[in-house]
């Protein structure tokens, strides 16, 4: 088996409310709307993030986005009105955690020098 790409799914209760959050998070509208209750953003490496309506699973998703410069990303997100709920620095990564309106966890992570 050869894996050629990945799609991460995030379950939300209200797609309209989620669109507002994720458009600010990614800094642009969705790249695709395959169905009325779905929105997809393509990431620079080719992977996709899909936000979709699933009231039973809303709030239980976790998405980690690896960035080159966490401080720069936090500045961009602050301009969009998004503030992290927590920040941490470990031996391998610096992280900042956000929550979408349903409580899904979005983690921005920057590798520490020499770890990856």
Feature roles, as predicted:
Residues 1-19, 46, 61-65, 112-116:
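N-terminal beta-strand motif that seeds the catalytic metal site of vicinal oxygen chelate
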Residues 5-13, 55-116:
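Vicinal oxygen chelate
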Residues 13-21, 38, 48-50, 97:
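Secondary-structure boundary/capping motif
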Residues 18-23, 77, 103:
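Conserved active-site tyrosine of GNAT-family acetyltransferases
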Residues 24-31, 81-83:
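Conserved acetyl-CoA-binding loop of GNAT-fold acetyltransferases
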Residues 28-61, 105-111:
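Conserved short beta-strand elements that form part of the metal-binding/catalytic scaffold
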């Amino acid at each position: 088996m050869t894996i050629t790409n990945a799609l991460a799914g995030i379950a939300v209760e209200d797609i309209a409310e989620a669109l507002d959050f994720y458009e600010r998070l990614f800094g642009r509208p969705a790249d695709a709307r395959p169905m009325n209750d779905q929105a997809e953003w393509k990431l620079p490496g080719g992977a996709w993030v899909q936000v979709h309506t699933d009231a039973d699973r809303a709030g239980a998703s976790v998405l980690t986005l690896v960035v080159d410069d966490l401080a720069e990303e936090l500045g961009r997100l602050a301009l969009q009105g998004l503030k992290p709920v927590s920040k941490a620095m470990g031996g391998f990564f610096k992280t900042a955690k956000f929550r979408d309106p349903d409580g899904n966890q979005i983690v921005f992570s920057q590798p520490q020098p020499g770890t990856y």
